[in-house]
A protein has these predicted regions:
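N-terminal pre-catalytic "stem/leader" segment of glycosyltransferase-like enzymes
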Residues: 1-43
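Short N-terminal targeting/anchoring amphipathic segment
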Residues: 37-53, 67-73, 183
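Short glycine-rich, flexible loops that bind phosphorylated cofactors or substrates
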Residues: 51-53, 77-78, 101
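Membrane-proximal helix-turn-helix segments that form the acceptor-binding/catalytic region
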Residues: 75-91
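A short, active-site helix/loop in glycosyltransferases that binds the activated sugar's phosphate group
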Residues: 89-111, 121
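C-terminal alpha-helical cap of glycosyltransferases
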Residues: 119, 123-145
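Conserved NTP-donor binding/palm subdomain of two-metal-ion nucleotidyltransferases/polymerases, i.e.
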Residues: 135-256
Length: 256
């Protein structure tokens, strides 16, 4: 899992949880299967104040479909109702139950997780804290992915087609479209789609009709060109003609 840590701290202020970010970012990779990155994250952890700037930053990621964990750098100190109502992370991380209770009071539907900062309590230690964060990141990411796949499956069901191959190919294309939106296209997604296209039998006209119904025909033509240049698909296995266009070139930039 690729995680990006963002600090929105400015000036010479020394908030309570300033060191927490650096502790997690510098040590989390030793606990689980985590890679700390600057680009193409699977999940983002934002440390900042309860402010409009923080809200805008988080919205930029959630709009792309990237889950966000938020930690208030000053705990309860900066919690103000006008600001809190603008914040919409996937999960609020709190260092104590009082902060969690206040967030739930202000935002009853918010998802909140309490993980104590080991610098300020004897009830935990660094290793335990890091494991809790690793578990939190995995849970947030996995639940987000499950939600994405559920939405994709619901879209594919609207086709009302019994052909498994068409349903599977459409599902993979829709997930690739989602990966493109979040600017994180893994090579294995391309190779898996190439394999599925090569090894599946389907009616090409029905496939093209499915693309039209899902409004992904244009995207599919761009993907065919991408699979030809960056994977192992050849023209004979394409259900729709390839188009090496602007979208193809943009997708190439986000392959990891």
């Amino acid at each position: 899992m690729r995680i990006k840590f963002i600090s929105l701290l400015k000036g010479t202020a020394y908030p309570l949880n300033k060191e927490l970010l650096y502790t997690i970012a510098n040590n989390i990779s030793s606990i689980g299967d985590v890679e700390v990155v600057d680009n193409a994250p699977d999940l983002v952890h934002v440390f900042g104040k309860w402010s409009g700037t923080t809200a805008t930053t988080m919205k930029g990621y959630t709009h792309k479909g990237i889950p966000v964990v938020f930690t208030s750098t000053n705990g309860l100190v900066d919690v103000l109702p006008p600001h809190s109502l603008m914040l919409a992370p996937t999960v609020f991380h709190c260092c104590g139950p009082a902060e969690a209770e206040l967030i739930k009071k202000l935002l009853p539907k918010a998802s909140v997780k309490v993980i104590a900062n080991e610098q300020f309590t004897l009830t935990t230690d660094r290793t335990t804290m890091l494991r809790q964060f690793n578990d939190l990141y995995a849970k947030v990411y996995n639940e987000h992915e499950a939600k994405v796949m559920s939405e994709i499956n619901n879209k594919v069901r609207t086709l009302n087609i019994s052909d498994h191959a068409i349903n599977e190919i459409c599902s993979q294309l829709l997930y690739l479209q989602y990966a493109f939106r979040r600017e994180t296209i893994r090579q294995r997604l391309l190779d898996n789609l190439s394999d599925t296209l090569i090894n599946s039998n389907y009616d090409e006209e029905s496939m093209r009709q499915a693309f039209d119904t899902l409004k992904i025909s244009s995207f599919a033509t761009s993907v065919m060109a991408l699979l030809e240049s960056k994977s192992h698909l050849t023209e004979g296995f394409m259900p729709i003609a390839a188009s090496d266009d602007k979208t193809t070139k943009q997708m190439q930039k986000h392959i990891i």
